[in-house]
Amino acid sequence: MSCPMSLSNPSQILLRNSELLVAKVPLFINLPEDGFIEAYTEIHKPDTIHCFNTNFIDYQAITKKHCSPTKTKNVKATFASTYQTTSCHDLVIIAFPKSKAELNFTLAMITHCINDETKIILVGEKKGGIQSAAKLTQHIFSCCQKVDAARHCLLFVGLFQPERLSDVFNLQDWFKKYQITVEGIELTIASLPGVFSQQKLDVGTALLLSNLPSKMTGKVLDFGCGAGVISCFIGKKFSGTNLSLLDVSALALTSAQESLALNGLSGNVFPSNSLSDVNEHYQHVVSNPPFHQGVKTHYQASEDFLAGINKKLNKQGNITIVANSFLRYQPIMETHIGNTRVITKDKGFTIYRAQLS
């Protein structure tokens, strides 16, 4: 069948193999809103499509397109770090994640809602590592067969081993916990598979923590919080702060919440598409801005954040970020916030600070 041009390459290879996708109650895991859901519905007319996304932007797009009061009720969208349902799915389509550990996490997470006849489809771009799908799933699948290769993508079909379906999924088993010490402050960080800098403190964040403002009080926003390292450090060092942490990833948000708890801290942890759901004003904003989406480098979200954050700062509020030195963030900050200083440079990273006048 012909595919609408708006479809991503993985969605196109799925529709090329439409005969494999017949189902009454399918589950789509981390598929984007690119027209595939609509095309699938027209072809197969399922009873209900369940869409589970750990990315808030994809979840918002699916909800807007398919779950508004004026739309049909056969699409159910969920944004969370883990999937819970009373349904039993006869088909699961998984967008192959950039983290191999995240694939194992995802497969373990769905054992409660499938059976040994549930068809599992793995789809993704070759450069994302999907070539290793059969090897990665050999301990959990009874078979995993490559059925198509097209548009720089691969499509695998697998079935679970029945004995694996009895395993009970426990989220706590999947946190990787590690200890770090910065400026004499000891922290315990918890990180789920797929979350940035799992199991260690990255160079950029370490540089940022050593170059924060000398005094911090009031409301602090940690933009792109990941596992919550920055907020945990600030909360421990500056007891007069009120922490808010945002990220686009449900896996990151759950990790950050766990990290706060492990360090005896609390904070407002919430999802946001850049600044879409930021409703407060802050005295301090800190960030190691993310610029990777999936396996692609993508700067727009960080640039939008820097261009819009002035509207979320208190008068005399400041923002401190760390970035790869090759990124041209200083002119954006100068234009939209004000005088922007280079605090330090080291190991390919630069610390910038700007204060709203």
Curated annotation (Swiss-Prot):
What's the protein name?
Answer: Ribosomal RNA small subunit methyltransferase C
Task: Please report a single Pfam family linked to this protein.
Answer: MTS_N
Principal subcellular localisation of the protein: cytoplasm
Record field: catalytic activity: guanosine(1207) in 16S rRNA + S-adenosyl-L-methionine = N(2)-methylguanosine(1207) in 16S rRNA + S-adenosyl-L-homocysteine + H(+)
Which Gene Ontology terms cover its molecular function? 16S rRNA (guanine(1207)-N(2))-methyltransferase activity; nucleic acid binding
UniProt keyword annotation of S-adenosyl-L-methionine present:
yes
Q: Which organism is it from?
A: Colwellia psychrerythraea (strain 34H / ATCC BAA-681)
Metal-binding as UniProt keyword? no
Subcellular localization: Cytoplasm
Q: To which protein family does this belong?
A: Belongs to the methyltransferase superfamily. RsmC family.
- Give an example GO cellular component term for this record: cytoplasm
Q: Which CDD domains match?
A: AdoMet_MTases
Complex formation? Monomer.
Gene3D superfamilies documented for this protein? Vaccinia Virus protein VP39 (3.40.50.150)
Annotated function: Specifically methylates the guanine in position 1207 of 16S rRNA in the 30S particle.
Keywords attached to this entry: Cytoplasm, Methyltransferase, rRNA processing, S-adenosyl-L-methionine, Transferase
